[in-house]
Amino acid sequence: MLEEINYDTKLFGLIGKNIKYTLSPYIHNFSFTTLGINAVYLVFDLDEMKFNRIINGLLEIAEGLNVTIPYKEEVMKYLDNTDTYSTRIQAVNTIYKKSGYNTDYLAIKNLVRKKIGNMSGYECYVYGAGGAAKAAAFALSELGCSSISIVNRTNLRANELVELLNKNGYNASIKENCNSTSNIVVVNSTPNPSVVPENCIQKSELVIEFVYKPVETELIKNAKKYGIKYIDGLEILVNQAVEAEKIWFNKSVSDEKIIEYLYARKLVW
């Protein structure tokens, strides 16, 4: 973080609700210092009433913002424009000068390419139907996933996501649980790492976890136990932050350097 805030200091921040746990200010303030950027990153923890009252003001004074639960979809109507990916996904998690982007989507594509590469022939099960689920479902579909199954507590949100995916030419449906026997990729985009049954994990080629505190959730522990490839929530958090900084500054600190810093500060375990 900057030792001194001055007239030229740029404002960045995270908008969400009940986000006391977030690591985003540590990640971005570390990056700003490392890159020599005169900027500060703050957290704006807003209930719905406060969000509606101050979002336009924040968009005017902030150089860039990140957006998390529950505002990834709601924020779009306040923006001047959105890029191709976030428009299709209908969710934004990064803003630069009132333009919206989705770096969750970019992070999933980046990380899955490293772990597996082409997804042709894989069946993908996405637990959850919110903004993160949308980003993951679109990323996996674009990497070639043959089908996307949405598993969610309520059918209303699941139906909306399935319709959105099918409208974009992908093969999506609602399932109560995973019932395939091979070539499965499982994504947990919910706050509950226990939502994915162990027998589903056993059949998977890759599991993807959005929860990052702790890094080794029950889902990740089971993936390790059965020798399954995995992408943990910290990898996603850091990579989407790096992609956001590329949008803001056309440069960033490496994923590895940020993760090393977070562990050194004992901010993750």
From Swiss-Prot:
GO molecular function: shikimate 3-dehydrogenase (NADP+) activity
Chain sites annotated for binding shikimate: T22, L23, S24, T68, N93, D104, Y212
UniProt keyword terms in alphabetical order: Amino-acid biosynthesis, Aromatic amino acid biosynthesis, NADP, Oxidoreductase
Record's signal peptide: none
GO annotation terms (biological process): amino acid biosynthetic process; aromatic amino acid family biosynthetic process; chorismate biosynthetic process; shikimate metabolic process
Classification via InterPro entries: Aminoacid_DH-like_N_sf (IPR046346), NAD(P)-bd_dom_sf (IPR036291), Shikimate_DH-bd_N (IPR013708), Shikimate_DH_fam (IPR022893), Shikm_DH/Glu-tRNA_Rdtase (IPR006151)
PANTHER family for the chain: BIFUNCTIONAL 3-DEHYDROQUINATE DEHYDRATASE_SHIKIMATE DEHYDROGENASE, CHLOROPLASTIC (PTHR21089:SF1), SHIKIMATE DEHYDROGENASE (PTHR21089)
Known role: Involved in the biosynthesis of the chorismate, which leads to the biosynthesis of aromatic amino acids. Catalyzes the reversible NADPH linked reduction of 3-dehydroshikimate (DHSA) to yield shikimate (SA).
The family this protein is said to belong to: Belongs to the shikimate dehydrogenase family.
Entry protein name: Shikimate dehydrogenase (NADP(+))
Organism annotation: Saccharolobus islandicus (strain L.S.2.15 / Lassen #1) (Sulfolobus islandicus)
